[in-house]
UniProtKB/Swiss-Prot annotation:
It holds the Pfam family WD40. PANTHER family: MRNA EXPORT FACTOR AND BUB3. This is mRNA export factor. WD repeats lie at residues 37-79, 84-114, 125-157, 168-206, 215-255, 271-301, 310-346. It comes from the Eukaryota. It is found in: Cytoplasm; Nucleus; Cytoplasm, Cytoskeleton, Spindle pole. GO terms for molecular function: RNA binding. Its main location: cytoplasm. The gene is Rae1. Belongs to the WD repeat rae1 family. Residues 15-34 are annotated as: Disordered.
């Protein structure tokens, strides 16, 4: 029996194979196009964990829906299932065993989607839109962490309608990440808080933001022992900060770099600066991808402090990205991110999710 029971696809499921895509300015990198992409802006992407055989991709959109595809080794994508919220879906994540997907929405709720039964139930409630959602698997507890614009961080046992714990945030939650035993939350007004999750979640440290502009995305990275050791933080000002929690030499080890900017130098020619919409670390190499409102993705080696690759420019922003569990596939979503306001929104423009073979391009150059 398949994970999703009988065929429960959505839309018209055409196929899209490696190497068979047509190229134009919506897909200048000749990457694989995911079939039946959402009908409105795509806000979040997440691949299934390694506990699940195969690769499944989840996307949440401003059409209030969450979609799931199976990604086959050939590159073919098969629509599997779909669930709805009553507001835009801002974040998605998986349970560690791959049996559940958790979704956060502007409708002020979070849901748990059981992929075997294809049933979704509400598991969380906030007083404002829920911006982030993460599954926490600790030795002594499991829970879902939700961050909201109501300035709270809540932790939920999925069997109870009341939160296990509520932590107050200094401002609205804008982005967050979790790799046990660490969580990091970035808020409005450039707030930045690290939490430790052992035994029970608690605030570990508040950090003065290394960035001067609004926080947009954050991703935790690991050290060589596979332990979370720091995070990358992106802002609307085309800049990423690499920040270690306990570095031997903070002034030397922590740094920021510019990205997602046009080629002007700011002195002789004005430079266009774009938001960093997403950051994802490669699960094997520890290198990272950034995507931006400029319609490009870039790959970086933070240890060598070098850029590995920048894509050609797509004809609309790249709103989200993620790697699959072994780092062979890089997924990125091309859709309007509202960075230029409603007057630049074109409802006729299609939204796309692309898949790229990432096995070689993310390797650090100094590795033999």
């Amino acid at each position: 029996m398949s994970l999703f029971g009988s065929t429960s696809g959505f839309g018209t499921g055409g196929t899209s194979m490696f190497g068979s895509t047509t190229t134009d300015n919506h897909n200048p990198m000749k990457d694989i196009e995911v079939t039946s992409s959402p009908d409105d802006s795509i806000g979040c992407l997440s691949f299934s964990p390694p506990t699940l055989p195969g690769n499944f991709l989840i996307a949440g959109s401003w059409a209030n829906d969450v979609r799931c595809w199976e990604v086959q080794d050939s590159g073919q994508t098969i629509p599997k299932a779909q669930q709805m919220h009553t507001g835009p879906v801002l974040d998605v994540c998986w349970s560690d065993d791959g049996s559940k997907v958790f979704t956060a929405s502007c409708d002020k709720t979070a849901k748990m989607w059981d992929l075997n039964s294809n049933q979704a139930i509400q598991i969380a409630q906030h007083d404002a839109p829920v911006k982030t959602i993460h599954w926490i698997k600790a030795p002594n507890y499991s829970c879902v962490m939700t961050g909201s614009w109501d300035k709270t961080l809540k932790f939920w046992d999925t069997r109870s309608s009341n939160p296990m714990m509520v932590l107050q945030l200094p401002e609205r939650c804008y982005c967050a990440d979790v790799i046990y035993p660490m969580a990091v939350v970035a808020t409005a007004e450039r707030g930045l808080i690290v939490y430790q999750l052992e035994n029970q979640p608690s605030e570990f440290r508040r950090i003065e933001s290394p960035l001067k502009h609004q926080h947009r995305c954050v991703a935790i990275f690991k050290d060589k022992q596979n332990k979370p050791t720091g995070f990358a933080l992106g802002s609307i000002e085309g800049r990423v900060a690499i920040h270690y929690i306990n570095p031997p030499n903070p002034a030397k080890d922590n740094f920021t770099f510019k990205c997602h900017r046009s080629n002007g130098t700011n002195t002789s020619a004005p430079q266009d600066i774009y938001a960093v919409n997403g950051i994802a670390f490669h699960p094997v190499h520890g290198t990272l991808a950034t995507v931006g409102s400029d319609g490009r993705f870039s790959f970086w080696d933070k240890d060598a402090r070098t850029k590995l690759k920048t894509s050609e420019q797509l004809d609309q922003p790249i709103a989200a990205c993620c790697f699959n569990h072994n780092g062979n596939i890089f997924a990125y979503a091309s859709s309007y991110d509202w960075s230029k306001g409603h007057e630049f929104y074109n409802p006729q423009k299609k939204n796309y999710i692309f898949l790229r073979n990432a096995a070689e391009e993310l390797k650090p150059r100094n590795k033999k």
